[in-house]
Amino acid sequence: MGCIMSQTDDAASRSKKIDRLLKEDQENANKTVKLLLLGAGESGKSTILKQMRIIHDVGYTKDERRVFRSVVFGNIILSLNAIIAAMEQLKIEYEKEEHRADARKVLAFGATGEEDEIPDELAALMKSVWSDEGIQKAVARSREYQLNDSAEYYLSQLDRICEADYIPTQDDVLRTRIKTTGIVETQFIFKDRLFVVFDVGGQRSERKKWIHCFEDVTALIFCVAMSEYDMVLMEDRKTNRMRESLKVFDSICNSKWFVETSIILFLNKKDLFEEKIKKSPLTYCFPEYTGHDNFDDGSAFIQKQFEIVNKRQGGQKEIYTQFTCATDTNNIRFVFDAVTDIVIRDNLRTCGLY
């Protein structure tokens, strides 16, 4: 009889332990927020991920920033090469013949995309070429060819960047351009929750890999480069970038994978958009647009174009839209704080705790 009682007590004890562990696992799961960061290529996703590391983690140490030297150098050289090539393509004349000769020498140096250093001779040539008025005209027409957003930022600071002891700043790191391939995962603690953020390659060739991130995602952040309404894709040089973003957002927003998932729309690069719309009309992408060529009218129109693709409107599925500047740490800090409250609230509602 005593043995039977002992076995019964052991079974009850094991059952309670299992129940407690299951409860703890559920509580931990409820405190984990998984964010999927999506968007077309060059929408600013990776920059936003870097901001999250700066804001919510330790940022980048001096040694880590030093590693980005080669990336900055590569971005600068490739950008200047693209501008020089565009001079001929756009039939823009150099202000001075000596600058044309220096441009040829810059091209002769070649570029791998990640240079270990910028030789003094190349630095002097680059500064000479960058000072040319014709080069500045080519930069102003960058929508007509492929040029990194960071090009002007870096090239205007060649004196600092070409110093022998140069170490990239946090801002320099934020503006580096490295194509995201595959899936990059970042984790940090914020508001007593573990955030796991997945950045997925944005170019067309990478999208087939997104499916592996879909399970159990708490929320989705979709990034759109507002300023690219008058530009074409790097992949095919024909498709309008804004139209491509709309197409991808439609497929994501209405996907069976995201029926219960909160969707946050980041209309990014608002600073570039505000300047560009003054000189490049929004009708380039949207012929039906009748508003003024200013930020307020243009941004409201773009927001509407994305929100109307939602086939689960009327309370079934809400899209939370934020206007962002991924290179502005204070802006991303403010926006992410607001977004986090939305995500936590929706997550609690899904768990039946709100």
Curated annotation (Swiss-Prot):
Subunit structure: G proteins are composed of 3 units; alpha, beta and gamma. The alpha chain contains the guanine nucleotide binding site.
Name of this chain's protein: Guanine nucleotide-binding protein alpha-16 subunit
Biological processes per GO annotation: adenylate cyclase-modulating G protein-coupled receptor signaling pathway; cell division
Binding residues annotated for GTP, in chain numbering: 39-46, 174-180, 199-203, 268-271, 326
InterPro entries: Gprotein_alpha_I, Gprotein_alpha_su, GproteinA_insert, P-loop_NTPase
Secreted in keyword set: no
Annotated source species: Caenorhabditis briggsae
Gene3D superfamilies xrefs: GI Alpha 1, domain 2-like (1.10.400.10), P-loop containing nucleotide triphosphate hydrolases (3.40.50.300)
